[in-house]
Structures are given as structure tokens and as C-alpha cells.
């Protein structure tokens, strides 16, 4: 049987980079990782509460965290930062202050920057949010997957694979459905592949969405 490996972890150091950049003593390492996870969850929850979008897409592609002794630098890569800024003009300052209080980082300054990504629908996280929104609104899964593929084609990607697993369309028995368009060379390390695994709660239960996007050549 083929062993499935995370495509991002498989390519670290070649075409993919780390999203957390810092050094720590081995005994403090787990604390640092947990802190990163809490920061990411806090930011996602804040954006979810304060962003009013019709599609239900928050548009966070990834959150990079760089730590120094006296500074925590957080870079939020977003597809639609304008919506967040329009709905909360002072949102970034507010988020920065709240995070500083939450993590009690008195000795360390906390700085948040937002970077817009050029082609939002070429990112698997944003695409997974889009599909999740469609499934919550009871759109047929095939229609949602086809629409997602149309959106990625506009973003000039070389290939995409979308997989949805669970009680699809409320059927009694859980199953896995997938669709592929273009090339997705998972075995080639030089091929830059972006990947995302996303969980969505629908009225029928939990569905898992996985997306692989082949961005650029081998």
C-alpha cells in the first residue's frame, strides 16, 4: 500500500519553507510550538468574528511567526485584506493589543503585518474555505468542486486535486469523492505543491476537504 505523506513536509527546504521561524532550547520547544498554535487560532477566530463576507471566506492563506528575544513578528498572508480593513478600520491595532494582553508578552514587543497574496484562489486554504461555505449552504458537492476548479484556472495553476470525504449529501454511508484537473506530480520533490486539509461541519456531520495545487514546474 502507498504511504501518504504530507506534501508540504515532504518538500521542506526545497520548494517549501517553514511558517514558524525561531530557535529555542529543547526543553522550551514544546511551549514555543503551543504558543504559535494559540496565536494562529486567536487570529483566525478574530478575523472570523470581524469579517463580514457574503461568501464566508475569511481568506487567510497562512500565518508566519518570527520570534526574537525582544520581538514577535507575525505576518498574515491574506487573499482579501481590504474586507477586514473596511469592516474594522482599527482592527489591526486592536488585534495587536488583544494578542499582547492574551499572551502577556511584556518583555517582547508584538508586531502584526498583513500581506496581500496576488491570486487568492490559487491558495488551497482559501479554496477549502470557499468549498466549505458552499457545502454549508447545501450546494451539491460536485458543483462546489467544479466551481473551485474554475476559480483556480483563473489563478494560472498547473493542476489541482480536490477530495471530499464523509457523509456527502447526507448519505447514510460515508465515502470519498475526488476530482483532478491538470497535473499533480506528488512524487516529484522539485514540483512546488501547496496542500491543505480542512474540516467543515455540516448538518449531516463532519466532512474533510483536502486540496493539492501544483503551482510551478519541476
From Swiss-Prot:
Instruction: Indicate where this protein is primarily found.
Output: plastid
Q: Which GO terms describe its molecular function?
A: rRNA binding; structural constituent of ribosome
Keyword RNA-binding found: yes
Q: What SUPFAM superfamilies does this protein map onto?
A: Prokaryotic type KH domain (KH-domain type II), Ribosomal protein S3 C-terminal domain
Q: Which GO terms describe its cellular component?
A: chloroplast; ribonucleoprotein complex; ribosome
KH type-2 domain span = 47-118
Q: Which PROSITE patterns match?
A: KH_TYPE_2, RIBOSOMAL_S3
Subcellular location as annotated: Plastid, Chloroplast
InterPro entries assigned to the protein according to its UniProt record, in alphabetical order: KH_dom-like_a/b (IPR015946), KH_dom_type_2 (IPR004044), KH_sf_prok-type (IPR009019), Ribosomal_S3_C_sf (IPR036419), Ribosomal_uS3_bac-typ (IPR005704), Ribosomal_uS3_C (IPR001351), Ribosomal_uS3_CS (IPR018280)
Sorted alphabetically, the keyword list is: Chloroplast, Plastid, Ribonucleoprotein, Ribosomal protein, RNA-binding, rRNA-binding
GO terms of biological process kind = translation
Q: Which Pfam families match?
A: Ribosomal_S3_C
Instruction: Write out the similarity annotation.
Output: Belongs to the universal ribosomal protein uS3 family.
Does Nucleotidyltransferase show up as a keyword for this record?
no
This chain belongs to the protein called: Small ribosomal subunit protein uS3c
Q: Which NCBIfam families match?
A: rpsC_bact
The entry describes its oligomerization and partners as:
Part of the 30S ribosomal subunit.
Gene of this entry: rps3
Amino acid at each position: 500500500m502507498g504511504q501518504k505523506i504530507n506534501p508540504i513536509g515532504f518538500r521542506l527546504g526545497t520548494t517549501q519553507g517553514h511558517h514558524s521561524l525561531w530557535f529555542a532550547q529543547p526543553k522550551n520547544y514544546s511551549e514555543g510550538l503551543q504558543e504559535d498554535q494559540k496565536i494562529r487560532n486567536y487570529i483566525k477566530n478574530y478575523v472570523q468574528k470581524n469579517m463580514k463576507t457574503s461568501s464566508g471566506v475569511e481568506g487567510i492563506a497562512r500565518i508566519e511567526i518570527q520570534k526574537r528575544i525582544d520581538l514577535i513578528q507575525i505576518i498574515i498572508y491574506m487573499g482579501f485584506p481590504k474586507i477586514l480593513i473596511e469592516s474594522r478600520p482599527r482592527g489591526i491595532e486592536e488585534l495587536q493589543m488583544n494578542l499582547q494582553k492574551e499572551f502577556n508578552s511584556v518583555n517582547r514587543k508584538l508586531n502584526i503585518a498583513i500581506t496581500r497574496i496576488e491570486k487568492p484562489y490559487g491558495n488551497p486554504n482559501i479554496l477549502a474555505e470557499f468549498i466549505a461555505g458552499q457545502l454549508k449552504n447545501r450546494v451539491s458537492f460536485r458543483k462546489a468542486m467544479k466551481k473551485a476548479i474554475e476559480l483556480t484556472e483563473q489563478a494560472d495553476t498547473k493542476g489541482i486535486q480536490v477530495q471530499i470525504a464523509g457523509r456527502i449529501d447526507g448519505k447514510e454511508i460515508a465515502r470519498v469523492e475526488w476530482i483532478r484537473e491538470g497535473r499533480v506530480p506528488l512524487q516529484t520533490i522539485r514540483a512546488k505543491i501547496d496542500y491543505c486539509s480542512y474540516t467543515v461541519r455540516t448538518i449531516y456531520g463532519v466532512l474533510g476537504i483536502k486540496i493539492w495545487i501544483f503551482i510551478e514546474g519541476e
